Curated annotation (Swiss-Prot):
Protein name: Glycogen synthase
Catalytic activity reported: [(1->4)-alpha-D-glucosyl](n) + ADP-alpha-D-glucose = [(1->4)-alpha-D-glucosyl](n+1) + ADP + H(+)
Pfam family, one: Glycos_transf_1
Gene3D superfamilies assigned to the protein according to its UniProt record, in alphabetical order: Glycogen Phosphorylase B
E.C. numbers: 2.4.1.21
Annotated pathway: Glycan biosynthesis; glycogen biosynthesis
The keyword Glycosyltransferase is annotated on this UniProt entry: yes
The protein's role, per its UniProt record: Synthesizes alpha-1,4-glucan chains using ADP-glucose.
Organism classification: Bacteria, Pseudomonadati, Chlorobiota, Chlorobiia, Chlorobiales
Length: 489
């Protein structure tokens, strides 16, 4: 089998621009394309959520991929598949649909109790089994199935159990990538026992009748990766930030490969971006001002000459720094900035953010929805981006931001350290801080604002940031070698 014929199937719960919740969506939007550039054939499978616009993304039905039977122990659910090409590529992307499971919801909520947990487990099991049933009907045999995060973690186990006797899957290898170790997919065992055969349930990673899907993936996969060497080092340890992954790796004697995320310049380049108000480059930055004006208009904030526009774009949870941001708002607003907060999640954080909108309507604005086009506008229009993460695997938002001349203020954790050079005298591409505290965040914002108001410091910093090289090339080469090693080439 030649290198050109090696086939990789990527499985994920989110792929940009169709659905974006975390940085995984951006990984899925760009990385498979770079793998094709390395000589592999790539395809993608994801759920067809109700919020995905068929017409906008040119999804179409595939007659031979309709009415696929998905057997879940004592019942059979039907699966239909739609297909389109990943934008700006020829990569076939398959959307698995069942009205009961995916009509209204856009994500697999990680809920561990009550009816929501039962429903979520049904979605997960249906999707994971559905991927393998779709491959059987399609007749396209991947050499490697590359699974991403806990919601795809059943596939390696299913291949070893329910599908072990299928000749079609003989010699198919599995790779599992951890993008967020703190989201592990913990659910009561009883919900899986309702849907899966005993041989599958016996292979679930289960402690005190609770299944851990992330650990289930680790237990059965043949190759394990994560999004940066620094984050891999963190996960190998026994600190709270490893979330138990290090212990499980030791028990399995499984190496964890850290591979730095990259950025696809075909999708993220302010000089050619069709989704922003006006394009710009280091040679002419006037367009960034126009994007700032439009972003302010969209967020219903007034224009303020000389006042920096600062943003926070993330899921509202403690690990991505939403609580720290909420605790810091008083000190941040006092530094004479305008702040846009884009995201959703923890209801207490949402409420606290809205209280500041009421108290400071000309300085603070919050928006939950973030389409692909709006994300591009936000990245282009902001001056500074806050990333006060407690834990960060690598992320890609800071790379997009720097490419668009938006300077990140980020906590020095995980892959952040490998992608942002801390600002110093005539050096740096962003601002890093160590302490996960109000003082750490607000103090580093103060440092950034001093540079912002300095006519020599700021333009030089922006130019350095925009000149950063975040190419996927080296990572794609490294992944290509991992794939070939896995296939015994």
């Amino acid at each position: 089998m030649s290198r050109r014929n090696s086939k990789v199937l990527y499985v994920s719960g989110e792929v940009a621009p169709f659905v974006r919740i975390t940085a995984l969506a951006d990984f899925m939007a760009s990385f498979p394309q770079t793998v094709e550039d390395e000589g592999f054939e790539a395809r993608i499978m994801m759920p067809k959520y109700g919020i995905i616009n068929d017409r906008k993304f040119r999804l179409h039905d595939v007659l031979r991929l309709s009415d696929i039977e998905v057997h879940l122990k004592d019942k059979v659910d039907m699966l239909d598949v739609k297909v389109t090409a990943l934008p700006s590529s020829k990569i076939q992307t398959y959307f698995l649909y069942n009205e009961k499971y995916f009509k209204r919801h856009a994500w697999f909520p990680d809920l561990s109790t009550g009816n929501d947990a039962r429903v979520t487990v049904e979605k997960i099991v249906f999707f994971n089994v559905g991927v393998l049933e779709t491959l059987l009907r399609l007749g396209w045999k991947p050499d490697i199935i590359h699974c991403n995060d806990w919601h795809t973690a059943l596939i390696p186990l299913l291949l070893k159990t329910m599908y072990a006797s299928h000749e079609f899957f003989r010699n198919v290898k599995t790779l599992f990538s951890i993008h967020n170790a703190y989201r592990q997919g913990n659910f009561p065992l009883k919900h899986f026992q309702r849907l899966l055969p005993d041989e599958v349930c016996a292979g679930l990673h289960c402690v005190k009748d609770e299944v851990n899907l992330l650990f289930t993936g680790i237990d059965h996969v043949e190759l394990l990766t994560t999004t940066s060497p620094r984050y891999a080092e963190c996960l190998r340890g026994d600190t709270p930030e490893a979330f138990g992954v290090g212990k499980r790796l030791l028990e399995r004697e499984l190496p964890l490969h850290g591979m730095v995320n990259g950025l696809d310049a075909r999708q993220w380049n302010p000089a050619i971006d069709k989704m922003i108000k006006k394009r710009y480059s280091t040679e002419n930055m006037n367009g960034k001002v126009e994007n700032r004006k439009m972003l302010l208009e969209e967020m219903k904030l007034p224009w303020r000459d000389g006042m920096p526009l600062v943003g926070f774009i993330a899921t509202f949870d403690d690990y991505q720094g939403a609580k720290l941001l909420a605790d810091s708002l008083e000190k941040l607003i006092a530094q004479d900035i305008q702040l846009v907060i884009i995201g959703f999640g923890d209801k207490k954080c949402e409420q606290r953010f809205q209280e500041f909108v009421v108290a400071h309507p000309e300085q603070v604005s919050v928006q939950a929805e973030c389409s692909d086009s709006f994300l591009h506008l936000a990245i282009a229009g902001l001056d500074l981006l806050l990333m006060p993460s407690k834990v960060e695997s690598c992320g890609m938002l800071q790379m997009s931001a720097m490419t668009y001349g938006t300077i990140p203020i980020a906590r020095a954790t995980g892959g952040i350290v490998e992608t942002i050079q801390d600002h110093g005298e005539n050096l740096g591409t962003g601002f890093l801080f160590d302490d996960y505290s109000v003082e750490g965040l607000s103090g580093r914002l103060a440092d950034a604002l001093r540079c912002f108001h300095d006519d020599e410091c700021w333009p030089a910093l922006v130019e350095r940031a925009m000149s950063s090289d975040f190419s996927w090339h080296n990572t794609a080469e490294a992944y290509g070698q991992l794939y070939r090693n896995l296939l015994g080439k």
